[in-house]
Amino acid sequence: MRGLEDKRVLVTGGASGIGAATAARFLEEGSAVCVLDRDAAARQRIQRELPNLAGTLDADVSNLQQVESAFANAVRIMGGVDVLINNAGISIRHKFLDITPEEWAKVLAVNLTGVFFVAQTAARHMWQRGSGVILQTASTNGVMGYPFYADYNATKAGVIELTKSMALELAPKVRVCAVAPGYVLTPMQRAEYTDEMLEEVNRKIPLRRHAKPEEIAALFAYLASDDAAYATGHVFMLDGGETAGGLASR
């Protein structure tokens, strides 16, 4: 894709799942890539799998001081950050009536406050430089109701509206978009769903399957490229047709 060669890319939650696939895709496009992830074992694994990474960083995205320190390290390593993939997130499958205050606070701290901390830190850097692209991982959960993920759903709705507001305020210097995947076969998804549950979900998706992380990564690469230079403020659904009919067959 045009314009990705030599871009400097930071991917949060970049050591597994969608983040790892996205890091790999940008490397294929000739970009310099740093990944940020809390999971030490996952960081070691991604370093082995992607030896051309510019660096791996450890930070809790819900801690502003750690975010600022990690971002400064990314700038030091790569000489700047042109593209942020704001992807770090967690989910907990539980009934609404069973959500504890601690669980609620944890999911919001990572999925919304953490997204804000990373986005604001990157935006200040990009605004000063005069250009940049911020792409955030939302979810179809942010636009549709799903049981057992009330806290996660609320955070992803927040990411969608945060993205729109950022795009309006940061234009014309910085483009901001979000990708809202549907069901994606990631380690996080695997940990929460049995094979029977996965098959049941597949029957309700028009394309009859989960997305691959690489398919989400491809959209991130396009949106960061010069081919998408007129795209900002948009949320791109990548869900196999799931939201077209509101998962009508369920």
Positions of predicted regions on the chain:
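Active-site helix of classical SDR
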Residues: A119, T155, T163
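Residue(s) in the substrate-gating loop at a strand-loop-helix junction
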Residues: S139
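Alpha-helical segment proximal to the catalytic Tyr-Lys
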Residues: R124, A167-P172, A229
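Active-site loop immediately N-terminal to the catalytic Tyr-X3-Lys motif
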Residues: L97, M144-A150, R208, D226
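Short C-terminal tail/terminal secondary-structure segment
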Residues: M144, T232-R250
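C-terminal helical subdomain
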Residues: A178, E199-D227, A231, L238-G240
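Substrate-binding pocket helix/loop in short-chain dehydrogenase/reductase
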Residues: K95-F96, E103-A105, V201
